[in-house]
Amino acid sequence: GSEMCIRDSFYFHRIMKAFLGEPVGTFIVRTRTEAAARLLRYSDMPIADIAYRIGYSSPSSLSKVFKQFYGISPLEYRNNKNFVIMKPAIIRPELELKHEIKEVPARNVIYLRLFGDYKLNDYCSAWMRLCQFIQEEKLPMGEVMPYCIYHDDPKVTPAEKLRTDVCMVLPSFATAKGDIGFKQLAAGRYAIFLYKGPYEHLQAVYDTIYGKYIPEMECSLRDESSAERYLNNPADTAPEELLTEIYLSLIHISE
């Protein structure tokens, strides 16, 4: 138990650094905003529909973030065909991601909430604390696959107020104690993408999900925190064999 936990905490730390210095939260927001830009340019979809499709609760939320990224409103961008977005998406149509839409049951988690810049959080210590808590409270060992939830949009929320929950999924209930919380993640419908390959290609994976898969799927993203699970350990796995699960919460268009 503890040896595996210690080993896995280092692996978790490596994963969080694998995004080439860009925190996951910023990365997801930027990718969503670029997806909006593509839909504005290449589709006739109304701006409100685009906002809901990529997971914003209102067109004004999308407009605010879009303006912060590009200095121009979604409507101005749609009407000004000469405006070029600096970072082109890396859509790889040949990238075959296994994906399924799945009803995920409720899950029990213990978690440590971190406040502050996603880049500066000490994920390693947080994971170690969860492992220590399990041993102290004599709880059954949870999943050794780290599960992280990012609650805030770093383009809208000041860095010091950003909230991250580092979670361990448990087989049973636990009682919160001190700064370690317990909660049940609600059951829900998710698009779950399974990517096999090196972490440095995750940007292309997200771009491909938002640019290719989401527009083709008959569903919309819920305005909710996304999550990731890391299924194996880079310390003893070849980069091309690494498995990453990406969870995106869904609503069906018929809802």
How does the language model describe each region?
Residues F10-A18, E22-R30, E34-R41, M45-A48, ...:
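A solvent-exposed interaction/effector surface
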Residues M4-I6, E255:
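Short, small-residue-biased leader/transition segments that mark boundaries at the very start
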